[in-house]
Regions:
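Beta-strand-rich binding/interaction modules
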Residues: 82-129, 136-140
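N-terminal carbohydrate-binding accessory modules
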Residues: 68-69, 75, 161-193
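Short, solvent-exposed loop/linker segments at the N-terminal edge
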Residues: 73-85
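Hydrophobic/tyrosine-rich beta-strand signature of extracellular beta-sandwich/beta-rich modules
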Residues: 33, 107, 160-162
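Short acidic/polar inter-strand loop motif in beta-rich domains
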Residues: 36-42, 149, 165-171
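Exposed aromatic-hydrophobic patches
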Residues: 14-21, 135-143
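Accessory beta-strand-rich segments of carbohydrate-active enzymes
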Residues: 1-73, 97, 113
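Short glycine/proline/serine/threonine-rich loop/turn segments at secondary-structure transition edges
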Residues: 23-28, 42, 100, 144-159
């Protein structure tokens, strides 16, 4: 709507801007993304343009921070042989409302492109209070059964859906893609994935 919200000097890293204060609710809005490449900014090919997706994300005042989900499987190699893998899921939740909120998270793991009903693991956290204007990282352990490992030959991917609940009501759903894989270094065979 004619306001510059921000600039980003480097094209190979993700970035986002909160445009809430510039949106005219109930009216037509113009959102412009512009590339202005007057001076080369790299020693490599300095072409320019938009070559990845540009997304408009609408969130509830209480939501998972952008790129706010971290998933780790520290014992994957040992646990995968038994069929159940314990995933440590950390989600950073932001409370942009005017009051403290009691937040509960439910993490559900299912094959990418599938439905939540195809879940192979789920966990719900205890309620946690997040003060107005604050953020909190909430930890959970999800027992995942039957996950197929990711490899270059079989790039199996899963979606970890994080549902944010306030007062028992789901106010946001945030998806993170994940592949269950581990790396190995060996003096004779080198690096393997």
């Amino acid at each position: 709507n004619g306001h510059e919200v921000g600039t980003h000097p480097y094209g190979y890293t993700p970035f986002s801007y909160d445009i809430t204060d510039y949106v005219k609710v109930g009216e037509e809005n113009m959102i412009t993304v512009k590339v202005d490449h007057q001076t080369p900014s790299s020693r490599w090919y300095s072409g320019s343009g938009i070559y990845r997706s540009v997304d408009l994300t609408i969130t509830d005042p209480v939501h998972v921070d952008l790129y706010g989900t971290k998933i780790e499987t520290p014992n994957l190699k040992e646990e995968a042989a038994n069929g159940t893998v314990n995933a440590d899921v950390k989600a950073t939740v932001v409370n942009e409302s005017d009051t403290a909120q009691e937040v509960t998270l439910t993490h559900t793991v299912f094959p990418k492109g599938g439905d939540k009903e195809d879940e192979i693991g789920t966990a719900t956290t205890e309620a946690q209070s997040i003060e107005a204007g604050e953020r909190a990282t909430i930890d959970a352990k999800v027992a995942v059964t039957g996950a197929e490992l990711w490899s270059t030959e079989a790039p199996n991917l899963y979606t970890v859906r994080t549902e944010v609940k306030v007062g028992g009501e789901v106010v946001e759903s945030y998806d993170t893609d994940y592949g269950f894989r581990y790396v190995k270094f060996h003096p004779d065979t080198g690096f393997s994935l």
